[in-house]
Design a protein with these regions (language model features):
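Catalytic centers of nucleases
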Residues: 17-99
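Charged, low-complexity interaction regions
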Residues: 244-249
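Extended, hydrophilic extramembrane loops/domains of integral membrane proteins
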Residues: 103, 137-141, 145-199
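A recognition module on extended beta-rich or small alphabeta surfaces enriched in W/G with H and D/E
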Residues: 89-153
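Glycine-rich short-loop/terminal segments
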Residues: 1-44, 58-62, 184-210, 214, ...
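Charge-dense, intrinsically disordered terminal/linker segments
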Residues: 67-84, 88-98, 181, 189, ...
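Generic structural hydrophobic/aromatic packing signal, biased to beta-strands
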Residues: 49, 103-105, 233
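Membrane-active amphipathic alpha-helices enriched in small hydrophobic residues
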Residues: 216-237, 250-254
Length: 254
């Protein structure tokens, strides 16, 4: 339980730090009305991704660079540019400006890109089907960029842990609250599992320590036989002292 408590505390610290950084962005209005959610996405991605790893007992994987350089994040030491645009095609086209690094898109947009590249017959975004023309344009942009990079699309396109709507200014508080609640829920579940396992192991150990019925009966029988033999030996010896041997016993002696 100590390990679980430590993992929980570490995860929540990551969320708190990210939330503070996001609130600073919101209060300062960084990025303006149209760009603020991009900065929110960077810090939220870092905090939530690291919090989830911390709860699993793993080291941090993501760092927010926050230095106005070309890369927004370092993920496992690799530079990553984060793009959260409302328009999927415009979002993809920015990849040409960052060919020295991976690109990260919102989770729901990556689901669309993945479905397109897997050749799904129907592709949806926010419950609405994309037209065949939209699907074709998305596929074309990804294939052209992949050819220039010399990589398959899944080697340079990464998915955020967050959807586009989750990093909007009016939604980010709820996003962090839900993530915090999720960590607490998992903590409660794992605590119950640990407690149940401890009780099960304790019961199994107790049961193993007890002799089974067959062993108990066998032990009782052996004990009775030994006691009976001992009593008979004493009886014969007493008769011998009285001058009577066993072959001289009468029915009354028996």
């Amino acid at each position: 339980l100590k390990d679980l408590a430590a993992r929980r505390a570490n995860a929540l610290r990551n969320l708190d730090l990210a939330n503070q950084n996001v609130m600073n962005i919101v209060n300062s209005g960084r990025g303006g009305e149209n760009g603020i959610h991009g900065f929110i996405a960077e810090f939220a991605q870092t905090g939530i991704a690291n919090a989830r790893r911390a709860f699993e007992g793993l080291e941090k994987s993501t760092i927010t660079l926050n230095n106005n350089g070309p890369a927004d994040l370092l993920i496992n030491g690799k530079p990553v540019q984060v793009k959260f645009y409302a328009n999927l095609m415009n979002e993809l086209k920015t990849s040409a400006e960052y060919r020295s690094m991976d690109m990260m898109f919102s989770k729901d947009h990556m689901d669309v890109f993945r479905a397109v590249m897997h050749g799904d017959k129907e592709v949806f975004l926010n419950g609405q089907p994309l037209t065949s023309n939209q699907v074709q344009k998305i596929k074309q942009i990804i294939e052209e960029e992949s050819n220039i990079r010399g990589l398959s699309w899944d080697k340079w396109m990464q998915s955020s842990v967050l959807k586009y709507d989750q990093v909007q200014r009016e939604a980010i508080d709820r996003t962090f609250t839900e993530e915090t609640d999720n960590i607490k829920r998992q903590t409660s579940e794992q605590k119950s599992e640990i407690s149940n396992k401890a009780n099960t192991d304790k019961a199994a150990a107790y049961h193993k320590a007890q002799p089974n019925l067959g062993e108990a009966n066998k032990a009782a029988g052996v004990g009775a036989a030994i006691q009976g033999g001992l009593n008979f030996g004493i009886f014969v010896y007493q008769k011998h002292e009285e001058g009577k041997e066993i072959w001289q016993f009468t029915a009354e002696d028996w």
